[in-house]
């Protein structure tokens, strides 16, 4: 009989622990955030369709390449605290490769996005332009047709 009580107690503990983990995994609440816009550094351009940027204004974490595939530089500007950079285009730069390659680089308006529902690697700013947070959610993978 004591074995049954121990098993029941252990099962009860596992259920209670599982409920706490489940509640924690539910994640984001449903209320809307008060975010003005978001920036998600993305890969842009190609050897045949170059971008207009320079190393100073390029995003940290992104690499910038020539039309021949030579690395020109790594981006120097932090989206959370951008550098004051000249607006000229470095004609040696044709394209960028960033850790995130899909989706929009600028999210405006943000709709009901919150810090919790915002995508990891994206930076969100208030309506006053001040940095608020980095997104916390994984971005859904784009649907790929197998046909």
UniProtKB/Swiss-Prot annotation:
Q: Which SUPFAM superfamilies match?
A: Plant proteinase inhibitors
Q: Does the keyword Protein biosynthesis apply?
A: no
InterPro entries, per the entry: Prot_inh_I20, Protease_inhibitor_I20
Query: What induces the gene encoding this protein?
Result: Not induced by wounding.
Q: Name the UniProt key words of this record, in alphabetical order.
A: Disulfide bond, Protease inhibitor, Repeat, Serine protease inhibitor, Signal
One GO MF term? serine-type endopeptidase inhibitor activity
SS bonds (residue pairs): 28-116, 32-112, 40-122, 52-89, 55-73, 56-85, 62-98, 115-133
List the residue(s) that the UniProt entry marks as the site Reactive bond for chymotrypsin.
87-88
Q: Does the keyword Signal apply?
A: yes
Signal peptide residue numbers: 1-25
UniProt site (Reactive bond for trypsin): 30-31
Which Pfam families does the record match to this protein? Prot_inhib_II
Stretches forming sequence repeats: 25-82, 83-142
User: Which family does the entry's similarity section mention?
Assistant: Belongs to the protease inhibitor I20 (potato type II proteinase inhibitor) family.
The protein's role, per its UniProt record = Inhibitor of trypsin and chymotrypsin.
Put simply, this protein is called Proteinase inhibitor type-2 T
